[in-house]
Amino acid sequence: VPIQKVQDDTKTLIKTVITRINDISHTQSVSSKQKVTGLDFIPGLHPILTLSKMDQTLAVYQQILTSMPSRNVIQISNDLENLRDLLHVLAFSKSCHLPWASGLETLDRLGGVLEASGYSTEVVALSRLQRSLQDMLWQLDLSPGC
């Protein structure tokens, strides 16, 4: 498979996930930069410049989304899995060794936050995920390093 096709597929999937997030209407109600106490473990406030950082970020979001009780996020979580696979193919094409990122070390914190404020966590996570995906889309055009 030509690597340009993989890169195009990656961008298309990113755009699809962004559209899915937009379709969940309540995600529009919070800024991705808004500071919400207890949710600082959710990435999305810093630029994502490398393929390994993209994979790590997606691993964290995937872990967060699969822990949420909401059914809205199941397809998005599946899409993130596929997106991570595509990033690994891109990394391999650049001779990058991309270890399979595992996400958050401490799920205890996540469980407590979800119990206390599941709705807020979902809104903030999806909003920041959307911002992170937009960053990734932009970075892919710049041919990111390992």
UniProtKB/Swiss-Prot annotation:
Cellular-component GO terms for this entry: extracellular space
Subcellular location(s) of the protein: Secreted
Residue spans crossing the bilayer: none
S-S bonds: C96-C146
UniProt entry tagged with the keyword Acyltransferase: no
Acyltransferase found in the keyword field: no
Key words, A-Z: Disulfide bond, Obesity, Secreted
Gene Ontology MF term list: hormone activity; peptide hormone receptor binding
Biological process per Gene Ontology, one example term: positive regulation of TOR signaling
Main localization (coarse): secreted
A Pfam family reported for this protein in Swiss-Prot or TrEMBL: Leptin
The family this protein is said to belong to: Belongs to the leptin family.
Function field: Key player in the regulation of energy balance and body weight control. Once released into the circulation, has central and peripheral effects by binding LEPR, found in many tissues, which results in the activation of several major signaling pathways. In the hypothalamus, acts as an appetite-regulating factor that induces a decrease in food intake and an increase in energy consumption by inducing anorexinogenic factors and suppressing orexigenic neuropeptides, also regulates bone mass and secretion of hypothalamo-pituitary-adrenal hormones.
PANTHER family: LEPTIN (PTHR11724:SF1)
Protein name: Leptin
Organism per entry: Pongo pygmaeus
